[in-house]
């Protein structure tokens, strides 16, 4: 059987004089880039530079819309209506698409960020608002969401091509949700363990939850983080091991309606 998977990373998350992540290096190992749109991180200069970097590395350009919370890096939940979620999603997609367009390139995908991503995984109304915003903007865009989540379900319902996302360095709850970052066991720090878990997700569609039970999971795209101290070493290792296992790394294909 031929296995293939997309590798994505949240990048362009610097702001002004503050540099976050190792975008230049991580870009060499990924196939899809989720580019911050200015609300939780990123600004006009950084979006411009990050898209140039994606083009240079033949990486799919994606928008990474978040809640309007620079200080909290978009990781704090907010009381926000589905209508406002729709508006902020359209607004942020437009920012990244505009920069891609003036450079003669297209947007491939959209992946919500942080608290917005987590809210959309469980809240049907929020998920529907994001999916509808993406579809109304361009029905050919791919919607990235947590595997088996409400966002994936609503994306399919409105008619979008979706990508079930899994995380290389996060642990999972028995219900398939990510362990909150506030928990001590939220992250996987051992590279070998993280790589083994990813390969199992791609080949067997299974992952061991924190309580030791196996849960079913679909891995269309794997998120690797570019802002950790070992992120480069991990990206290199994961890329190498996936290829060793006969898993090809390639971006998702857009379906044109």
Curated annotation (Swiss-Prot):
It comes from Oceanobacillus iheyensis (strain DSM 14371 / CIP 107618 / JCM 11309 / KCTC 3954 / HTE831). It is an enzyme of class 3 (hydrolase). Belongs to the LamB/PxpA family. SUPFAM superfamilies: Glycoside hydrolase/deacetylase. This is 5-oxoprolinase subunit A. GO terms for biological process: carbohydrate metabolic process. It catalyses: 5-oxo-L-proline + ATP + 2 H2O = L-glutamate + ADP + phosphate + H(+). It comes from the Bacteria. Coiled coil: none annotated. GO terms for molecular function: 5-oxoprolinase (ATP-hydrolyzing) activity; ATP binding. Its EC number is 3.5.2.9. The keyword Hydrolase applies. InterPro entries: Glyco_hydro/deAcase_b/a-brl, LamB/YcsF/PxpA-like. Keywords: ATP-binding, Hydrolase, Nucleotide-binding. Catalyzes the cleavage of 5-oxoproline to form L-glutamate coupled to the hydrolysis of ATP to ADP and inorganic phosphate. The keyword Metal-binding does not apply. Forms a complex composed of PxpA, PxpB and PxpC.
């Amino acid at each position: 059987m031929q296995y293939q998977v997309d590798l994505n990373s949240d990048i362009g998350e610097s702001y002004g004089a503050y540099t976050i992540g190792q975008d230049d290096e991580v870009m060499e190992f990924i196939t899809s880039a989720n580019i911050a749109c200015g609300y939780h991180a990123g600004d006009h200069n950084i979006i411009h530079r990050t898209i140039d970097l994606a083009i240079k590395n033949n990486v799919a350009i994606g928008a990474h819309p978040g809640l309007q919370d620079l200080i909290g890096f978009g990781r704090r939940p907010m009381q926000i209506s589905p209508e406002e979620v729709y508006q902020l999603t359209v607004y942020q997609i437009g920012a990244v698409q505009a920069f891609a367009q003036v450079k003669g390139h297209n947007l491939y995908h959209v992946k919500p960020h942080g608290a917005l991503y987590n809210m959309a995984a469980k809240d049907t109304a929020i998920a529907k608002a994001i999916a509808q915003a993406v579809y109304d903007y361009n029905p050919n865009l791919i919607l990235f969401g947590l595997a088996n989540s409400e966002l994936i379900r609503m994306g399919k319902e409105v008619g979008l091509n979706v990508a079930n996302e899994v995380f290389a360095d996060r642990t999972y709850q028995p219900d398939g949700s990510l362990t909150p970052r506030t928990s001590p066991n939220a992250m996987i720090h051992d590279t070998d363990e993280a790589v083994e878990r990813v390969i199992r997700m791609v080949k067997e569609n299974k992952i061991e939850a924190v309580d030791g039970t196996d849960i079913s999971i679909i891995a269309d795209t794997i998120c690797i983080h570019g802002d950790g101290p070992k992120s480069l070493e991990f990206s290199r290792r994961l890329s190498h091991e996936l290829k060793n296992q006969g898993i090809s790394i390639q971006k998702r294909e857009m379906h044109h309606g």
